[in-house]
Regions:
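Extended boundary segments
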Residues: 2-24, 70-98
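Cysteine-cluster motifs in flexible loop/terminal segments that predominantly coordinate metals
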Residues: 4, 39-55, 111-125
Length: 162
């Protein structure tokens, strides 16, 4: 069950950039990546907090800014570069009755049992977890669900309480 609330004054919230580090070769504006656990080599690095700890495991981030500062790194042969990232908006599905642009919802994956469904990655998207509070940034189109569920493709932005 998705809980939904909406207010006319509620604008789509813009995510606040986070400063972190990424390999010099990967440091390209617009690049999206999934934050995964670090290597054992990272544990004693003095940059561990800014590089690893300020991002959440399993979330999808997008590089929105590049800074000129670079540092040596045991994992990246060309070192790491300071970048600005935001959590990426995630394409997903919601029941049609909840698909209202600007609405705030509590995300729950659809848990589709059809392993071969072409919409499975939308119904169970990477980067969102059950219980996440999200805002519907964009309502896209109705999904022709093979199991007959009344679903709509949307773009979700997780709401991070400051």
């Amino acid at each position: 069950m998705i809980k939904c609330s909406f207010s006319e004054e509620m604008a789509v919230r813009k995510p606040k950039p986070i400063i972190t580090l990424i390999g010099v070769r990967q440091a390209k504006k617009g690049l999206k990546f999934i934050h995964e656990p670090s290597s054992e080599k990272c544990k004693d690095c003095q940059l561990y907090r800014v590089c690893i700890e300020n991002l959440e495991r399993g979330r999808v981030y997008e590089i929105v800014g590049l800074r000129n500062k670079k540092f040596p790194c045991l994992l990246h042969d060309e070192g790491v570069r300071v970048v600005e990232v935001v959590e990426s908006d995630i394409a997903s599905t919601v029941p049609q009755k909840s698909a209202l642009e600007g609405a705030t919802i509590t995300f729950h994956a659809q848990n589709c049992e059809n392993q071969f469904c072409k919409f499975k990655s939308l119904c169970e998207p990477v980067g969102l977890f059950d219980g996440d509070k999200c805002q519907i940034v964009k309502v896209e189109n109705k999904i022709e669900c093979p199991l007959g569920y009344d679903l709509v493709k949307v773009l979700l932005r997780r709401i991070i309480d400051a």
